[in-house]
Curated annotation (Swiss-Prot):
Protein name listed in UniProt: Aspartate carbamoyltransferase catalytic subunit
Annotated family: Belongs to the aspartate/ornithine carbamoyltransferase superfamily. ATCase family.
Molecular function as annotated in GO: amino acid binding; aspartate carbamoyltransferase activity
Record-listed L-aspartate binding positions: 82, 165, 219
Protein's organism: Thermobifida fusca (strain YX)
Primary gene name: pyrB
Pathway given in the UniProt record: Pyrimidine metabolism; UMP biosynthesis via de novo pathway; (S)-dihydroorotate from bicarbonate: step 2/3
Stated role: Catalyzes the condensation of carbamoyl phosphate and aspartate to form carbamoyl aspartate and inorganic phosphate, the committed step in the de novo pyrimidine nucleotide biosynthesis pathway.
One GO cellular component, as annotated: cytosol
Pfam families recorded: OTCace, OTCace_N
Binding-site positions, carbamoyl phosphate: 54-55, 104, 132, 135, 260-261
UniProt keyword Transferase present: yes
Classification via HAMAP family: Asp_carb_tr (MF_00001)
Assembly behavior: Heterododecamer (2C3:3R2) of six catalytic PyrB chains organized as two trimers (C3), and six regulatory PyrI chains organized as three dimers (R2).
PROSITE patterns in the record: CARBAMOYLTRANSFERASE (PS00097)
């Protein structure tokens, strides 16, 4: 595995290796000194063309805990705002000797194009409405930590599937790991190609809820919409929002997930978001461990050299 561009590029064994490595590395976050020397001397560039809070900070924390040098690049205030192309930015990073580039971009496929232009490792942190593979990995990790497994789980992904890179990556990864995925959304918020996805589709949240082990809520991405996809926010929430009444109909062991950012009162109520069934804050915590594992494996960590001092313990 040279890059991480798509959840669909991962084999089952590769995905499990990342999850297992993340579990070992999670112990670092519990130490008083949260550092490993594994990536000392390596340079990781966070190349973010879209706004981000959780993902950018998570990757920065992950790289720094592995002792890498981190450069944060924002399109605002850079040559990009003056019209510089992605390719020219890539060539600049190449000339500076970046070992790894974490990219978020509004254009689907941007990460794959970048990988053609640089020698270093490229990690896709979200490319438009296409994919977000590390989010899917941290979601799978969270499921495994809470429920003990991923294989055989019934996972409902609810909301704006059409504009969600998280949904696409989760469908690809979770089915690779043996989960059964059902997408729940109004027809207008499903992608045209959804019939080619390896999952089921439902328009009825109340029918799917009692059968699900995991319910993953997605926000409506109004910033990507140029027309109306549903009658009103109130009507959407009535049919597809997760509130306390719907939570009570879920199986006792079932968990509620959300990749963030949440719109409380629309796709999820504050009561549900703050409940013991919610894994929202755990997902953020787990994201650092998973991204540490991805950086560790892709940038030549000691996992290939047993006995090295950088090996997770």
């Amino acid at each position: 595995m040279q890059h991480l561009l798509s959840a669909g590029d991962l084999t089952r064994d590769e995905a499990l290796l990342i999850l297992d490595t993340a579990r070992e590395l999670s112990q670092v976050s519990e130490r008083s000194v949260k550092k490993l020397p594994t990536l000392r001397g390596r340079t990781v560039v966070n190349l973010f063309y879209e706004d981000s809070t959780r993902t950018r900070i998570s990757f920065e924390a992950a790289a720094k805990r592995m002792s890498a040098d981190v450069i944060n690049f924002s399109a605002r205030g850079s040559s990009v705002s003056k019209g510089e192309s992605l390719k020219d930015t890539a060539l600049t990073l190449q000339a500076m000797g970046a070992d790894g580039v974490v990219i978020r971009h509004s254009a689907p496929g941007a990460a794959r194009r970048l990988a053609d232009w640089v020698d270093g490792v490229v990690i896709n942190a979200g490319d438009g409405t296409h994919e977000h593979p590390t989010q899917a990995l941290l979601d799978a990790y969270t499921m495994r930590e809470r429920l003990g497994r991923v294989e055989g789980l019934r996972v409902a992904i609810v909301g704006d599937i059409r504009h969600s890179r998280v949904a696409r990556s989760n469908v690809l990864l979770l089915t690779t790991l043996g989960a059964e995925v059902t997408l729940v959304a109004p027809p207008t918020l499903l992608p045209v190609s959804v019939d080619t996805w390896p999952c089921a589709v439902s328009y009825d949240l109340d029918e799917v809820l009692p059968k699900s082990d995991v319910v993953m809520m997605l926000r409506v991405q109004a910033e990507r919409m140029h027309s109306s996809f549903f009658p009103s926010a109130r009507e959407y929430s009535r049919r597809y929002g997760l509130d306390a009444d719907r939570l009570a109909r879920m199986a006792d062991h079932a968990i509620v997930m959300h990749p963030g950012p949440m719109v409380r009162g629309m796709e999820i109520s504050a009561e549900v978001a703050d409940s013991a069934r919610s894994t929202v804050t755990e997902q953020v915590t787990n994201g650092v461990s998973v991204r540490m594992a991805v950086l560790y494996l892709l940038l030549g960590g000691a996992i290939h050299r047993p006995g090295n001092q950088g090996e997770p313990r």
